[in-house]
Amino acid sequence: LRAWAERFRPWSVWAPWRAEQHCDHVAANGLASDFVSATPERALVKMEYLVWGWADPDLAHHHGAKGIWGLMCGDEIQRRRQALACHRTQMSSVIDDAAEAFLIPPDLAALTDRPVEIFLECRR
């Protein structure tokens, strides 16, 4: 990752929101945080996106963002729907023997129909 960053010199690193409830999202955020911390010579910005975090009723009080960015993506709605549909284990009852199923509720899935995606800029 470091060699890639030295070659492409990104201004930012993007990861799922640090308070997401799924271990793979938390791990991805941890990797991004470690990378930003390990490159103090560059002023990298960590941007976080919400997946399950939208279901958090107290999101506005504890998201911890330095800034909130919106990216217009109305022309990508169909692709976003298709991408969400690829997550079969979260969109249907494919997994029926888990103690805690994690099906995406319809109101959360409907967020892919928004013409804007929201990103949280992390505090350093």
Task: Describe the residue ranges of each PLM region.
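Metal-dependent de-N-acetylase/amidase catalytic core
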Residues: 1-124
